[in-house]
Amino acid sequence: MESDEDEDDDKPFGDDEAKNAAFRASMAPAQLERHRREQRNKIYAMRVSNDGERYVGFQYQGPGTGDKNKTIQGELERCLCKMTGETRESLRVGGAGRTDSGVHARGQVVHFYCRKSLGEDLSKRKRAMNGMLPDDIRCEEFWEPHPLFHSRFHAKGKIYHYYLDAKETASPFSRKYAHRVGWRPPDVDLLRRACALFVGTMDFKSFANVSRDKSKADQNTVRTIRRFDVFEDEPGTIRLECEGDGFLYRQVRNMVGAALTVATGKHDLEYLQNLMDAKDRKRAPMGAPAHGLFLHRVFYPSVVLTK
C-alpha cells in the first residue's frame, strides 16, 4: 500500500487512536521524522537466518573489503540490488541486531526501502532471495510491514541463545555451534544461580565492550534482562536463553563468560555481584566465544508489523 502524501503522519492508523498512540510511543522524534521522509518509498522486511562462521558480522564494512571481510548485510544488499534494481544507498538496509563476527542468527529482522512495488505474492521474492544468497544465509520470511517500520528502533526485546558442550568427549558436530567446556564441566545448578543474578534492570557496564561505532545507545549501560534461563537438553548439552529489552556490545557473551567462572568453581556468586557493582569492564573475565551465540528472536509491537 502506497503512503498518501496528504495523510497525517502522526495518525498512520486514521481514527484508531489506540494504535496511533502505540505507534507514536514506539518512535523517538528524530526517528519518526526520518521515516516521514521515506514515506514515498515502499518498505519491506525480512526475517533472516545465518551461519556466522564466514562473516565479520552483520554490519556492512564499506567497499573493497574483499572475501575475507564479508558481512551479512553486504550479501543481502548484493542480492537485493539485483532483485530490485535499486542502489545500495537507496535500499538503506537496516538490521535489528548488529551481530558480531562469528555470531549466528535464526531471527535477525531486516528492513529496506524500494521505489517500486514488489508485488502481492512476496513468497516469490523470498524464493528469489534464497536463489541468490549463499547457502549459509537464508531468507525465512518476506513481508510488507507498516510504512514507518524500522527493524532496530521498533524492537522491544530480543532473545539470544548460547550453547555449551560440556561432555567429556565433545560431539564433533558441536565444534562450530557450541562452546566446548568438557575439560572443566560447569555445575548446572550453579550456572542457573549465576545467570539469575543478571535478571532485572541494572547497570551492565562491567559486561559491555566498547562499541565499534561508539553508538550513543551504548553510552547508557542500563538494560533490563527479563529472564536468563539454563536448560540441560541432555547430559552435557546446555542451552542458555537470555531475553532482554536490548543488549550492549558483547554483553551476552561477557555475561556467559562470567557465569561460567562461577559454575566451574573459579569464583563464587559474591564475585559476580561485586563485578556488577564495580561497573568496570577491566575487572571482568573474558567473554565466551562467538560461535556459541545465536540471535534467536526479536520482538515488535504488533502495530508496526503489518501495513
How does the language model describe each region?
Residues M1-K307:
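Structured-RNA-binding interfaces characteristic of tRNA pseudouridine synthases
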